[in-house]
């Protein structure tokens, strides 16, 4: 008997997650100077994290032999002030929002339960739901209607077996938001948990933030992250805002020390450096508009409106997305080929914001490729 006979059948069905490519990988594979590579593929903050974090991390070096606090009161207080939500309604994850997603599946899902996921969207939802035994009911962001959520495709899939519904807004990779009236209708149509993923909410209209819905409804969990505008993708800090009951259940099965000392210190400092946060947010929105307007000039591309720090682009010059992205890679440009996103045809790629210098170089290279 081989190890294959011991592995769960559901795991054998999975394909490994395809992340955005790194500068190191492209430099190694294509022989390009890493300093000349333009990385616009992973929805990161191109200005990095607060410069105050480096000094704070030095203070932690002498303590790395000690376990971190399972719950850091200072971090919880800072998140509470930032979100204007009570501490008791917040749970922090040490693998970004992915940990919160996985833990909520662990407390909700029994074999055969159902989870509704509109696609195309963030692929981790389906991976986590499936591994815990859920059956996926696919809804859709309608490609024929600028990827607006087809709300009926969600409502028609709700049954007594539905345990959770994932709503990413702004949606990854399409960049658009789901109208609040549609989310309200879904939340009030079921007692299943509705997970509102707000990973990119800072880049959206400030009036759209639905984090306080976690207090209005018992069946809402709002996901937030430090990986985007705060520039801490490498530290893996995410959190959820939800009812006290759900927080209590999640704390029973949450990994104890998943948030490292370095991660905690980084997140606290990032929240305290409000000036750097505002700079990154304002320049990020300006960068987004610069790339969007630049790409709109190319007739061979269809660029979709966005309220995130990235935008979805469709190739219309005869190439598929993988061929197009390969051409860009050879020129030192990393964008995200979206072929691996369920529900998308193989003609889409996603572009993240860059610094203004990176944007200028990127748009120049794009003009060489598409014209």
Swiss-Prot record:
GO BP field: L-histidine biosynthetic process
Keywords of this protein's UniProt record, alphabetized?
A: Amino-acid biosynthesis, Aminotransferase, Histidine biosynthesis, Pyridoxal phosphate, Transferase
Q: Which residues carry this modification: N6-(pyridoxal phosphate)lysine?
A: 228
Catalytic activity line of the entry = L-histidinol phosphate + 2-oxoglutarate = 3-(imidazol-4-yl)-2-oxopropyl phosphate + L-glutamate
Cofactor names: pyridoxal 5'-phosphate
SUPFAM superfamilies named among the record's database cross-references: PLP-dependent transferases
Q: Which InterPro entries match?
A: Aminotransferase_I/II_large, HisP_aminotrans, PyrdxlP-dep_Trfase, PyrdxlP-dep_Trfase_major, PyrdxlP-dep_Trfase_small
The yes or no answer to whether the keyword Transcription is present is no
Q: Which family does it belong to?
A: Belongs to the class-II pyridoxal-phosphate-dependent aminotransferase family. Histidinol-phosphate aminotransferase subfamily.
Q: Which PANTHER family match?
A: HISTIDINOL-PHOSPHATE AMINOTRANSFERASE, HISTIDINOL-PHOSPHATE AMINOTRANSFERASE-RELATED
**Name of the protein this chain belongs to:** Histidinol-phosphate aminotransferase
Q: Which organism is it from?
A: Methanococcus maripaludis (strain C7 / ATCC BAA-1331)
- Taxon lineage: Archaea, Methanobacteriati, Methanobacteriota, Methanomada group, Methanococci
């Amino acid at each position: 008997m081989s190890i294959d006979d011991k592995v769960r059948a559901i795991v054998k069905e999975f394909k490994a997650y395809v992340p955005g490519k790194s500068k190191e990988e492209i430099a190694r594979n294509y022989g390009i100077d890493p300093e000349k590579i333009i990385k616009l593929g992973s929805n990161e903050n191109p200005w990095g994290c607060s410069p105050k974090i480096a000094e704070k991390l030095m203070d932690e070096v002498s303590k790395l032999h000690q376990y971190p606090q399972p719950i850091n009161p200072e971090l919880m207080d800072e998140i509470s002030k930032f979100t204007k939500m009570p501490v008791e309604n917040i749970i922090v994850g040490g693998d970004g929002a992915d940990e919160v997603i996985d833990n909520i599946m662990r407390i909700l899902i029994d074999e055969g339960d159902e989870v509704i996921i509109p696609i195309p969207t963030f692929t981790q939802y389906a991976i986590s739901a499936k591994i815990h035994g859920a059956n996926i009911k696919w809804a859709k962001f309608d490609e024929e209607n600028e990827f607006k959520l087809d709300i009926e495709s969600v409502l028609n899939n709700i049954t007594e077996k539905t345990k959770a519904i994932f709503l990413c807004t702004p949606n990854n990779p399409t960049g658009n938001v789901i109208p609040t009236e549609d989310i309200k209708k879904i939340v009030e149509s079921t007692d299943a948990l509705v997970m509102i993923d707000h990973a990119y909410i800072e880049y959206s209209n400030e009036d759209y933030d639905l984090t306080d819905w976690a207090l209005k409804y018992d069946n809402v969990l709002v996901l937030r992250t430090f990986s985007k505008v705060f520039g801490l993708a490498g530290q893996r800090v995410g959190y959820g805002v939800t009812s006290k009951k759900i927080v209590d259940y999640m704390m029973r099965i949450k990994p104890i020390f998943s948030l490292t000392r370095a991660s905690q210190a980084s997140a606290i400092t990032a929240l305290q450096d409000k000036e750097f946060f505002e700079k990154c947010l304002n320049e990020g929105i300006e960068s987004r508009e610069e790339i969007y307007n630049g790409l709109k000039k190319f007739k061979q591309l269809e660029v979709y409106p966005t309220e995130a720090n990235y935008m979805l682009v469709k190739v219309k010059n005869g190439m598929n997305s993988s061929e197009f992205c390969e051409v860009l890679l050879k020129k030192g440009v990393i964008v995200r080929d979206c072929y691996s996103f369920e529900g998308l045809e193989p003609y889409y790629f996603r572009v993240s914001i860059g610094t203004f210098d990176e944007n200028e170089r990127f748009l120049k290279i794009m003009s060489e490729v598409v014209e």
